[in-house]
Amino acid sequence: MTDRSTLDDAPAQADFIIAGATLIDGGGGPARQGDLAVRGGRIVALGDFAHAPGVPVIDARGLALAPGFIDSHTHDDGYLLAHPEMLPKVSQGITTVVTGNCGISLAPLSRRQIPQPLDLLGPPELFRFATFRDWLRALAETPAAVNVIPLVGHTTLRVAVMDDTGRAATDAERAAMRALLDEALQAGAFGVSTGTFYPPASAAPTDEIIDVCQPLRGRAGAIYATHLRDEADHIVPAMEEALLIGRELDCRVVFSHHKLAGERNHGRSRETLDMISRAAATQRVCLDCHPYPATSTMLRLDRARLASRTLITWSKGYPEATGRDFSEVMAELGLDDEAAIARLAPAGAIYFLMDQADVNRIFSHPLTTVGSDGLPFDPHPHPRQWGTFTNVLRTMVREQRLLSLETAIHKMTGLAAAQYGLTERGLLRQGYHADLVLFDPANVTDTATFSAPIQVSQGIHAVWVNGRQVWDGERTGAERPGQVLAPGDAIPWSQQSE
């Protein structure tokens, strides 16, 4: 860490200078031309200053420089260990990921038989951490290219403690989950996520969640992120439940991948966003989403029947279905939808469920951040894993002009940092950590599509994490400077002696 007393003699002692860039500071204000100097992983100067002889200078004329993007919703828990170069993320400008969403986290859980949807996080051998601290220690010992904001999953707690997740937890089981959660928070988790949409947690009543999550109460900046029980016909009572839980626990509610699923719910984002705005007047609340009108998760009958189109992303029961339309696979097998799902199971799918007008309206809300919600181990993933952030810059900024460039960057950086309680990140400020992305605003674009989803973005010229370059516009480097971040002003794991 660079001592603050050294800031005044920079940029003469800078490690490098990025010169002539359009500086978009992440706070939502107007862009300006200027230079930025980095030393010891920190921003030590920005604006108009003299360049000392011998300091490397990167010519950024015609390019934009912004804080590194924060992916507010990921399932990268296991991918960080298996693929620490994090190519799908750094190639689109992401420098920090929020893990443990939708109720599923890699830890605390050590077992070989992994039920859906936990298997979305990767193969069974990754589930080897009996405590949250064990997983964080592994990340600190073998760092990835990006920073990590860890959440602990309520579903993971249920699977770790209960012999039957198809019922409410007993008092003893609640106490055991509460103890695991307390350990996770003490180790460095920012909060809890739930996924009561999914069977391992759908039997959990509201009072169980409140009881288990009691360790959140009184923790400054604690997060309660939720994949709602219902994002379709019954979304309003599901949102009311989440807001109640947030009030009872006195913590921030994050509505994950906010959407209105199914044609009969298209247009209802006006109603749900109004609920969020009204709630924000009396409690801490925010939301995230991605720019696509399709979502992805395990293959389910209810989702397939709601969707206008279903695309199979993987299947253990019938691998030949991967990458194909579900309707085509049903015809090939001569089965109806219910029988075909049983034949393909376990499997994953992309569902075309949402209306683009709702997506745009949600994105425009002032409390919305950007979250890819990608499933990195899928053989044929949703393109959001590789292209969410550059898709926003192409479609919502440049083509549709739905958002100004400064507003889009604010949602990707400063707003997300504020909502998750990060200090000295998310903005271009002297003394802040040098998480940076240099890109061409006129040409930046996603190339990942639903038919060919594994493709790097174009127009991202360079990415730095904690002052070290992890992407040069064409390839990742050997650097793995990512840190496991800690809530508030706590010391990040990578700087702890233990």
From Swiss-Prot:
<dbReference type="InterPro" id="IPR050378">
    <property type="entry name" value="Metallo-dep_Hydrolases_sf"/>
</dbReference>
<comment type="similarity">
    <text>Belongs to the metallo-dependent hydrolases superfamily. N-acyl-D-amino-acid deacylase family.</text>
</comment>
<dbReference type="InterPro" id="IPR013108">
    <property type="entry name" value="Amidohydro_3"/>
</dbReference>
<protein>
    <recommendedName>
        <fullName>N-acyl-D-aspartate deacylase</fullName>
        <ecNumber>3.5.1.83</ecNumber>
    </recommendedName>
</protein>
<keyword id="KW-0378">Hydrolase</keyword>
<feature type="region of interest" description="Disordered">
    <location>
        <begin position="478"/>
        <end position="498"/>
    </location>
</feature>
<dbReference type="GO" id="GO:0047422">
    <property type="term" value="F:N-acyl-D-aspartate deacylase activity"/>
</dbReference>
<dbReference type="GO" id="GO:0005737">
    <property type="term" value="C:cytoplasm"/>
</dbReference>
<dbReference type="Pfam" id="PF07969">
    <property type="entry name" value="Amidohydro_3"/>
</dbReference>
<keyword id="KW-0862">Zinc</keyword>
<dbReference type="InterPro" id="IPR023100">
    <property type="entry name" value="D-aminoacylase_insert_dom_sf"/>
</dbReference>
<keyword id="KW-0963">Cytoplasm</keyword>
<dbReference type="InterPro" id="IPR011059">
    <property type="entry name" value="Metal-dep_hydrolase_composite"/>
</dbReference>
<dbReference type="InterPro" id="IPR032466">
    <property type="entry name" value="Metal_Hydrolase"/>
</dbReference>
